[in-house]
């Protein structure tokens, strides 16, 4: 497993755990490229909120099958039908608020929302929020089909938690020479956090992340007990890649 802890307001990386035992694996899961699964849905919703003021967490979408024509993986010149399914294998048909669709990680709605807002806009938003890796402009991107690493994903989530202000991860805060003179100070030498989205977009994203823990059927409800132990607001998003190869919690 890999783990990153980062302060949203400062972008200071407080913990970086590449694996439970580096001597055995010698593989840094923080820097490795993996499919983020449903954790990528945050950028789909962010793009929708940012580019269409009529879309809010209470806007309703129906959980129903959607089929799209996409290039075949083996022969890009040939189109095939792609029909995404929910993790449970079926659609409920429910006309649900986006907040609930995000909390329950409904795949069909994420794909439809991605098509409505435009995949290119989703990519642009993801990059603005902190994703640096190349992203493929395909409908399946809404479900996290392009590889990213854990550090950039956490950094991008921190943008939402910092009210829409982005800053690259800070690993070193200060460097002194042997005489005690400051030769590097991150607060002076690194760019300050800059707004990359409207405040209301970040506010909506924060509400969505809380919904994953607080709404019935939310995918992060396993962390619910912590609400009673800490005087703070908690939220998050889970993600699982194909064949359960990777499991994420941000």
Q: What residue spans do the PLM features occupy?
A:
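Catalytic nucleophile serine of serine hydrolases
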Residues: 38-39, 105, 147
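Glycine- and acidic
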Residues: 23-31, 107-109, 133-141, 189-191
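Short active-site loop/helix that positions an aromatic residue
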Residues: 47-49
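Short active-site loop at a secondary-structure junction
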Residues: 23-43, 58-61, 96, 140
